[in-house]
Structure formats: C-alpha cells, structure tokens
C-alpha cells in the first residue's frame, strides 16, 4: 500500500461531529459525484472512488446524516490498471441531499464555490479539506526525490476556493491548470506536514516527519562529505603543484638560490608531501609558524618557479 493510501485509510477512521461529517461529505460528493436525470426516476447521485475505505466512509457518512436508501456497486475498470471502482448510489432524495450539502442551487445550478456555513468554522474548514484530499488528493512519500502534495479538482473556481481555504492556515498552497482539470499543490515539506496534521492524519504526519528528518540528515551529510572532498582535492592539487615547482627549481637553478626560509620549507614539502600546512609549520627547525605563514612561503616559491620558467634571472640568497 502506498503512503498516500495509508494516509487516506487513517483519515477514513477518524471520529467526527455531525457538522464535520457534513463538511467532509460535501467535498467528497462535490468532487467525486455524478448527477443523472431520468424520466420516471428523477435525480440520481453516484459517488465513485477506487479506494474501498473511502467508499465505506462515504456510505457511512450518508447513512449517518440522511439515512436515505443507498446502493453500493463494485465495477472493474477496463482501461489501464483494472482496479475496482466503488460506487455509492443515492436513488431517492438525491436532490434533498445535494441541496443540504450546498452543491445544488435553487435553480438547479451546480455550486462550485464554498459557503461560509460549510467552512466558516475552523473545524469545518479542516473537515472540508480532509474530504477534498480523500476525493482527489495524492502525496509523494518523503523518501522520494521531491516533496509534493496535490488535490485535483475538475473546476477552476472550486480549485481556487480550496486554495483560499488552505491558505487560511498559512499553507502557501498554489494552483495550476492541468489537462482536464486543475490542481492545488504544495512542495514545502513543512507545509505538507502541517496539512497532514490539519486534516487529522497524525500517524501519516509523524511518518512523513521521520522520513523527512532522515532524508534531510543524509542530504546534510552528503553536502558535508562533498565539501570536505572538494577541499581535500583542492589541498592535494595545491600540494602536487608545490612539489612540482620545487623539483623544477631543483633541476634548473638549484634550491640554493632560494632564501634560507624558503629553502627550508621547500625541502620539507618535498620530503613530507602528504602532511598538512599546519603540520609543515610545526616541523621547522627555526621554530613553528602558522598555517598562513607556511602558505605565504609556498606561494613565494611558486612565484619564483614561474619567473624561472619565464626566463627571468633569480639572484641567489
């Protein structure tokens, strides 16, 4: 089972008040419901999902709030993944339910925006967002390369209303048009964690946080190792260049042309090619000097080597 499925299963097991149940159901029906009209039968509502736990949640919320006759069907998808599709059907009093959920208007128009009666209270807003996530939400497991949570909506005005609702909780949610619909999305790990907590997925939030912390620690260690490796490569490269320049001087003009202080450090560098500048400074017979002092003397040797390569005469010490 995927991380998103685990989160949704947890959400379907939450205990809620009647008002919260209504807000959650309103989102589920608005986003996953299909209305049909037939002569002699009136209005029928089908709410479909591929998740059995969500289907049970829809069924139980409808029974709790309305106690209308309900049917539950299971069909097999014929395209791509041949998953089961669960359909909760309301054949009687569908119009009454849709009006009560503020989905169907007085003139039989579909209401895509959110009424303050349904989401004005903070707990109701949380419940509606929970229903929206159950209906059209997905989330990457934090172990994957990127953090991403999204909720798909068919209609732009409802998607914008969801964004505004989420951002009442400072989640920095954004919207994007997709083929055949619109999405609300979040990519900041802290905001995704806050959203999971907000809608009641406490276990999911804790699992997300655990994985995120481990991932961030690994990334920090990798950055540190990469930085240290780069510094080591830089140090090794500098040491090789220094040794090459000293040996070049030794072959061409001899190290005796160097001032005593430079000659001393040149001989130590060639003899001890693997030690650090600090260690070189501690080996000097004339007395220890700092890392920056050693670096300064080695740069002087590099400059003298370049002058010799250029044909300049070097006065002996």
From Swiss-Prot:
It holds the Pfam family LAGLIDADG_WhiA. It comes from Exiguobacterium sp. (strain ATCC BAA-1283 / AT1b). The keyword DNA-binding applies. Coiled coil: none annotated. It comes from the Bacteria. Belongs to the WhiA family. NCBIfam families: DNA_bind_WhiA. Involved in cell division and chromosome segregation. This is Probable cell division protein WhiA. The keyword Cell division applies. Transmembrane segments: none annotated. Keywords: Cell cycle, Cell division, DNA-binding. The gene is whiA. GO terms for biological process: cell division; regulation of sporulation. Disulfide bonds: none annotated. Gene3D superfamilies: Homing endonucleases (3.10.28.10). PANTHER family: CELL DIVISION PROTEIN WHIA-RELATED. Residues 276-310 bind DNA. The lineage of its organism: Bacteria, Bacillati, Bacillota, Bacilli, Bacillales. GO terms for molecular function: DNA binding.
